[in-house]
Amino acid sequence: MAMDGFETRQRTRWRTPEPEAGALRHPTLAEIRHVPGKRGLPLIGVMPEVILDPLAFSDRMVAKHGPVYRFHALGKWHLHFVGAEANERILFDEHGIFSAEAGWGPLIAPLFPGALLVKDGAEHRSRRRLLGEAFKQAELSGYQRIFARDIERRVESWQGRTIDPYVEARALTFHIAASTFLGVPLEEEAHVAIHSFAAMMGGLLTLVSNPKLSLVRRRGFAGKARLEKILSRLIEEKRASPGSDFLSRIALLEDEDGLLPVQAIADSFIFLLSAAHDTMASAITSLTYYLASHPGWAAAMREELAAAGIDDFREAATATLPLLDMFYKETLRLNNPAPVIWRRAVKDFSIHGLDIPAGTMTGCNLMMTHRLDGLWHDPLRFDPLRFTPEAESRRSRFAYVPFGAGVHKCLGMHFSQQQSKMFLAHLLLHAELECRDRRPPSWYHWPNCRPRRSLSVAVRPRCRGK
């Protein structure tokens, strides 16, 4: 959305380049018939199966076709790749074969044209370097103070109740979005901003991409427009009187031409907000459920905190706590917030003896790699001891990549890890959790991992010294 009064120089900086016409074309069936797979229904392909249960669909495809398979969806052929070798080849991308812009662009670019995820090459490096300034440890410490306050207030409201972790996690991340990221109180404008954001995300995920044909898509664009308007004003206010919130830090970023254009900041910030909001809600839900379901691990982690002399959960953010780290890693292995990472091949390549043509949509299926027999013993069992130093040394480092890998590795990885450790430590120090579900939950793995049905966790205050 262009903004009135912008100088020409501001409008052109960080501009999203138009793709070259005909630079890439999607492969025909004849070109990839040698890759095993499935066409599905006319036009929509396998989308009904994928939407019904993404994990079950992937599990069937891997069982029948192996670690590389094709499927037809919405008029195009796509390939999924499973395994550590594919993660290394595609995500690390040593030879520059894969484009994140062309892979994620069709899904993300209509609503997030300025997102870091849909940039490649020099433009990506420049943006990542600038935005990385907001993720340095000194900055993270400022965000943590705000985040800690939100955790204390929200988790205190859980005490003595039986909660649905996903509902509560969404409420918590609502507060975090307003305070840690936007730096505004939870008043009317914050509610408008976050509900606009929710409408925007709904518009992103609808299968009908044309706003003229989809009410959900129109609401998405309208929500983004409202959010941009609010952000534009907030950015100017933050520049005049910055705080310790995330938006204040980004608003003050400069390149060789000075302060970044407001629109460029808004574009980048909106996507960072969306990624943090959804992935954090997913992680907090899963951490709460698994903590309630594994009291033995809860006791062991409490002993670890006591041995480290930690009685303030804030200290856990940067402390060396191997058991907490292993618990967190195992949670993300089973319930990865980003189940699939998309790229598109810009050159021909070969993998597992298969020749793949340029133009192919290539997805690294992390949810299946993280459950792959051979990489993981008894892969569906929750077992944080998979992540002892000895166990990790026997595995490829690309077997576990919850935040991606290579130049597009999640910029907020350390932020997410530190917030999750603080959250875990607060629950361990201040609450006793008990899972009340009679059967294991079913998880839905798109676009982020979340439970299919309500979960039930009883929370009661913990007697200190217990």
Give names to the regions the model predicted.
Residues 46-66, 233, 311-352, 373:
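Conserved cytochrome P450 K-helix E-x-x-R motif and the immediately C-terminal K′/meander segment
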Residues 364-391:
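Conserved cytochrome P450 K-helix/beta-meander segment immediately N-terminal to the heme-binding cysteine loop
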Residues 33-43, 148, 244-248, 290-338, ...:
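Cytochrome P450 I-helix active-site segment
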Residues 2-126, 145-153, 378:
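N-terminal membrane-proximal hinge/A-helix region immediately C-terminal to the signal-anchor transmembrane segment
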